[in-house]
Amino acid sequence: MAAAAAFFCALLFISVQHGVLGGYTRNDFPADFVFGAATSAYQYEGAAAEDGRGASIWDTFTHAGKMKDKSTGDVASDGYHKYKGDVKLMTETGLEAYRFSISWSRLIPSGRGAVNQQGLKYYNNIIDELTKRGIQVHVMLYHLDLPQALEDEYAGWLSPRIVEDFTAYADVCFREFGDRVSHWTILAEPNVAALGGYDTGEFAPGRCSDPFGVTKCTVGNSSVEPYVAAHNMILTHAAVVRLYREKYQTLQKGIVGINVLSLWSYPLTDSTADLQAAQRYKDFTYGWILHPLVFGDYPQVMKKAIGSRLPSFSKVQTELVKGTLDFIGVNHYFSLYVSDLPLAKGVRDFIADRSVSCRGLLQGVRFIAQTMQAPTRSMGDPHGLQLMLQHLKESYGDLPIYVQENGKYRKASSNDSLDDTDRVDYIKGYIEGVLNATRNGVNARGYFAWFFVDMFELLSGYQTRYGLYRVDFDDAALPRRAKRSARWYRDFLKSKRQPLQIAQQ
């Protein structure tokens, strides 16, 4: 969910000069490293009202006209009907792995109770098709698309009741698909879901309170709800991991982890205050989620700044959540510079609690720190990804790490070009960043391009394109055509030598 990254700060994109030295091939990566691409259910599947699928909070959000282009994911890329052709394209591209998410409301329309047999058949068909073609299956149980029935019943992630219902849903997935799926990500970007859905109001379910919401929300509390939602997501993750480890892992031999948006933050200056601000940004962004799952509690800097608004873990909960990661999944798109801000007095939200200011280097490009607005330009910083991966190792130990989303978008236009050389350069540079991290001892296990095909974007609808394959959304047949980036990825995966990009500050 690349556009979502923008909300975490004024979205700085680092401009990096590159020189060429040597080269790399697919074979320069460890033998157990996989290259793939990814999609998510609401953004890809479409078929919103077909075969018994229940509504999700994103259906409600988009149908209320909340998207800037007034679009919905009702059709999206029509992956529900076109998955076989897309898997064929994956094979032709040489993908070694594919990461997709399951729509909870397609599998269990009301969020609990009876399984929708048509939904079960659909996901079995996808998994079988991938397995038949030798593509490793990576499944994400939740990509921000909560069943609307549970939102209506008890406000979804704001209630501890979500833990039981989600765990029951996960049990169905492990039971039905676990014989062919060995890589499970429980939640996608809980840091994004909590902030965008419950502070700024720019993501479903669109809750916020004045003066913090970017749009006018009718319900919400931006000072409290982001922390409550994230807390329940952490407890849910832990409960699902315990279920998997106790009931399935010995037999299925799979691994379970979580996914977080993980941008790199540089201090704007070398002052002590800015150095602390850069670390505070990391603690508030991904330490918010990872620190409890590794150590059993929130970062101390968050506890101090937020106080009683931050939920606490009981002793039993601490033992439940601690050590519940077999791997870390990260979504990374760019880096940013941050500087210190004094902690504001009075009512604060997450952004004010974090107390940092973000700066960009590109003149004439405005970003607003309080929003998640999609950036208009993206200049990559592969070295930032390398530093972020190394920081995760230093902070959380030698856990395997998968880069589960990385990509660059272009604005949609009537004459979308297939010649996306800028995306090729971007991906090439970021793969180099991962390679350098592995050479420095990081236990990186995979890289997934985001998206495989153009899809509905959660912030910008159909106004931006991330895919390796172009989807013509003006054609009812939604034909796919390979972009230059798809051809480059195919050649790379066939081990053709690629120029190595060396960052020069």
From Swiss-Prot:
- Asked if Cytoplasm is a keyword of the record, the answer is no
One GO MF term attached to the UniProt entry: beta-galactosidase activity
The protein's UniProt keywords, in alphabetical order, are:
Disulfide bond, Glycoprotein, Glycosidase, Hydrolase, Signal
Which residues take part in binding a beta-D-glucoside?
Answer: Q43, H143, Y333, E405, W450, Y466
Specify the enzyme's EC class, one word.
hydrolase
Q: Which InterPro entries does this UniProt record tie to the protein?
A: Glyco_hydro_1, Glyco_hydro_1_N_CS, Glycoside_hydrolase_SF
Disulphide bridges in this chain? C208-C217
Glycosylated sites: N221, N415, N436
Signal peptide start and end residues: 1-22
Active-site residues, Swiss-Prot/TrEMBL: E189, E405
Which is a GO BP term held by this UniProt record? carbohydrate metabolic process
Q: Which domain of life is it from?
A: Eukaryota
Per the UniProt record, which EC number(s) apply here? 3.2.1.21
What name does UniProt use for this protein?
A: Beta-glucosidase 3
Q: What's the source species for this entry?
A: Oryza sativa subsp. japonica
